[in-house]
A protein has these predicted regions:
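Short, low-complexity N-terminal intrinsically disordered segments enriched in polar/charged residues
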Residues: 1-39, 43, 150-154
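A beta-strand edge to alpha-helix "cap/lid" segment located at domain peripheries
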Residues: 2-10, 69-154
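Short glycine-/acidic-enriched loop or helix-start segments at secondary-structure transitions
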Residues: 15, 57, 132
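A structural signal for well-ordered alpha-helical scaffolds and beta->alpha junctions
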Residues: 18-22, 58-61, 106
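Hydrophobic alpha-helical core bundles mediating ligand binding, dimerization, or RNAP-core interactions
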Residues: 22, 29, 41, 61, ...
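Charged/polar, solvent-exposed surface patches and flexible loops
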Residues: 24-27, 39, 63, 67, ...
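A solvent-exposed, acidic/Ser-Thr-rich amphipathic alpha-helical stretch
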Residues: 34-38, 42-88
C-alpha cells in the first residue's frame, strides 16, 4: 500500500478492538459456535437484514440462529473483502456462503455494525436480491454439476 505524508503505517494493517469484535463474531458464526457469537452481542441487539423482519435481542438472535446454524444442518462461511472502522461503527464488504449438504449459495453482503462497550449492539446487513438469486441458482446447479458452483473468494 502506498504511504502518504503523515501516515504512520498502511491503513490495511490497522486493527481496532471494534473490527476484531466484528470479525471474531463472524468467525464464531462460521464455526457454528452460537454461544460464542451470542457472547459478543448486547442483550438489546438489533439485527436487520434490510427488507427482512428485524430480530431484536440476544434471545431473538439465539432463537433464529441456533436451530439452523449447526454442523450437519446448515453451514455459514464468510470472506471479508474490506473492513473499515470509524469510532464504534464497523463496515464490512464481504461474500457470505450458506450451505446445506452439497448446496452452496454465495452472495455479496454489506454489513454495518455498531459496537457498544465491547459488544455488537446493531448488526445491519444489506444485499442484492438479484445476486442472492444468482447465488441460489448456481448453488442448485452445483449440486448436480459441482463445477457450476463458483469457489468462495479468498
Amino acid at each position: 500500500m502506498r504511504q502518504y505524508p503523515g501516515m504512520t503505517r498502511p491503513l490495511a494493517t490497522v486493527h481496532t478492538t471494534e473490527t476484531d469484535i466484528v470479525t471474531g463474531f463472524l468467525r464464531a458464526l462460521e464455526r457454528c459456535d452460537i454461544d460464542a457469537a451470542l457472547a459478543m452481542v448486547t442483550e438489546d441487539l438489533v439485527y436487520q437484514n434490510v427488507s427482512l423482519p428485524t430480530i431484536r435481542g440476544r434471545r431473538g438472535l439465539d432463537r433464529a440462529f441456533r436451530p439452523m446454524l449447526r454442523p450437519g444442518r446448515m453451514g455459514f462461511a464468510v470472506c471479508v473483502h474490506h473492513v473499515a472502522c470509524d469510532g464504534d461503527v464497523v463496515l464490512t464488504d464481504r461474500t457470505d456462503e450458506i450451505s446445506v449438504g452439497r448446496f452452496r449459495a454465495r452472495f455479496w453482503v454489506y454489513g454495518r455494525f455498531v459496537v457498544r462497550d465491547g459488544q455488537i449492539a446493531v448488526w445491519r446487513d444489506s444485499f442484492d436480491w438479484f445476486d442472492i438469486t444468482v447465488g441460489m441458482v448456481r448453488g442448485l446447479a452445483g449440486v448436480l454439476v459441482p463445477v457450476a458452483n463458483r469457489q468462495m473468494p479468498s
